[in-house]
Amino acid sequence: MALNCDDKAHIRAIWPCLASHAEQYGAEALHRMFLCHPQTKTYFPNFDFHANSAHLKNHGKKVMNALTDAVKHLDHPEASLSSLSDLHAFTLRVDPGNFALLSNNILVVVAVHHSDKLSYETHQALDKFLNVVSGLLTSKYR
């Protein structure tokens, strides 16, 4: 599912609002994922899963910063995500289905905080973008 020029424009328009709250939104998305899908906690054995914990904020910021880097490289996001793909596939061995779960929760967080900016077109573009990212992160799984 390739991103077209309109998708990229919608992503670039809303992303600064998300990047400026990377820690908060990333932590909220992870917290929602862990609550709704407790099986995803298995990859974080020493985490404090309480809302606003330092663990959630730290990892949430990493997630959102990686997405911000991918947004900066929308024409070739695979270059910015290659090392993360290696890490998740070969070292962490994260269930590839978890990326879709987290993507959904990121969209929920965007809707909660930016419903006024989340037009149908922007929602669709973000969904496509997160699917592209998920696909790239799972591309090295066998």
Curated annotation (Swiss-Prot):
Positions of post-translational N-acetylalanine modification: A2
Tissue specificity of this protein: Red blood cells.
GO biological process, one term: hydrogen peroxide catabolic process
Binding sites annotated in the UniProt record for O2: H59
Keywords: Acetylation, Heme, Iron, Metal-binding, Oxygen transport, Transport
Domain Globin: 2-142
TM ranges: none
Domain of life: Eukaryota
CDD domains in the record: Hb-alpha-like (cd08927)
GO molecular function: haptoglobin binding; heme binding; metal ion binding; organic acid binding; oxygen binding; oxygen carrier activity; peroxidase activity
One cellular-component annotation, GO: hemoglobin complex
Residues the entry annotates as binding heme b: H88
Pfam families: Globin
InterPro entries: Globin, Globin-like_sf, Globin/Proto, Hemoglobin_a-typ, Hemoglobin_oxygen_transport
Role: The alpha-C chain is a component of adult hemoglobin C.
PANTHER family found in the cross-reference section: HEMOGLOBIN FAMILY MEMBER, HEMOGLOBIN SUBUNIT ALPHA
Summary of subunit composition and partner proteins: Heterotetramer of either two alpha-B chains or two alpha-C chains and two beta chains. The two major hemoglobins, B and C, associate upon deoxygenation to form a trimer of tetramers, BC2, that has a much lower affinity for oxygen than either component alone.
Family under the similarity heading: Belongs to the globin family.
Protein name, per record: Hemoglobin subunit alpha-C
